[in-house]
Curated annotation (Swiss-Prot):
Naturally occurring in which organism (per UniProt): Homo sapiens
Quaternary structure (record): Homooligomer. Interacts with STIM1.
Notes concerning its domains: The GXXXG motif may mediate oligomerization. The C-terminus is necessary for its localization at ER-plasma membrane (ER-PM) junctions as well as for the store-dependent rearrangement of ER-PM junctions.
Bilayer-crossing regions: 29-49, 69-89, 102-122, 156-176, 194-214
Protein name: Store-operated calcium entry regulator STIMATE
Keywords, alphabetical: Endoplasmic reticulum, Membrane, Transmembrane, Transmembrane helix
Renumbered ranges of motif GXXXG motif: 149-153
Region span, Disordered: 1-22, 227-268
Amino acid sequence: MQGPAGNASRGLPGGPPSTVASGAGRCESGALMHSFGIFLQGLLGVVAFSTLMLKRFREPKHERRPWRIWFLDTSKQAIGMLFIHFANVYLADLTEEDPCSLYLINFLLDATVGMLLIYVGVRAVSVLVEWQQWESLRFGEYGDPLQCGAWVGQCALYIVIMIFEKSVVFIVLLILQWKKVALLNPIENPDLKLAIVMLIVPFFVNALMFWVVDNFLMRKGKTKAKLEERGANQDSRNGSKVRYRRAASHEESESEILISADDEMEESDVEEDLRRLTPLKPVKKKKHRFGLPV
């Protein structure tokens, strides 16, 4: 015969499960926004964003962006990643499943399928911007001097791309029933689960995502700058005039001398070149009579 203590330890058959049973081996609902979860998220943001600073110093010096351009580029990406992060936190608490596992599944889908969708979205928007000639909406270009309106417009476009990406990932999550996949069931410590979901795995994946997406957002500006530089060089070559000067030789033949019109060659050098070329005599052909030289 068991006493009240035994019944309390097992929990009543018709009542709610005990606190130990509900919390053992799984994150509780809302655990992602508790104090420990918020601390891990802040630490992750600082560490992951520092990879963008490392990327800037790894760029060649002649292609390295000024700090203001770098900040405008990376701030768009930071805002987009914050949107994805809080969307994942919200979606993780919608069901009764383990929120840590759901967050991790959402995050991994964002890092795989989502990366492809972001690339397609950036390319599609770039084509539309070039077609409509919206110069202020070209990713990575903010005018000279810098215009805040250009940054706001590009940031809005990038957020639209992120909304599209998150919507597709959410549909994939629902169709394939990935919410039933329990990736973290073998781990029994909820705090360790939270650290894996919020810090350890996102650190490596976010570093890669920040690095790749930064190339998406800055590529158009670098390409356009190279095209403008190439066009300027082409114009400078086409703009230089070329003239011909004729000099009579002793044999009353004419030799053509090509002289560039960039005024870098002095007149004395031109005359010296003419004197050097005029003494050249043409080779006289020998006359033949009946096949024998005369």
